[in-house]
Amino acid sequence: WFLGVKPLAKFSSNNEIISPTLSTYEISYRNIIQNNLKHYLDIWNLIDQTWHLKPLKYEYMNFWKSNQEQEMFLQKGNALQNEKLSNFLRMLNVSIPHQSFDKINSYALFLIDKKRKLLEVGLNI
């Protein structure tokens, strides 16, 4: 889910809408993740044509993951639910600044809506 994400030289949570706001622990965790992303840079450089599926709104990820877990429960009888699902979604929403996903160096960008319908396609040649 973070293919191509690079550490940000400088990031601020002030321009993100996250509710509830980031805790001190979450801010500290974000810094750890930013440092850990440095270890992926060599891997990202080996991939020469990333295709980036990007939601129009970041929060669509919550909707998609919740639906995925509901389907898994219906099909397999087991899935993340209630507090476990909420905690997982919170981790996804706060671990990497949203602006990081705007800076992925991709060959192709596919912008999709909440229903995963294609809105726009672009090439970064």
Sequence positions of predicted segments:
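Conserved NTP phosphate-binding and transfer environment spanning the P-loop NTPase/kinase superfamily
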Residues: 2-125
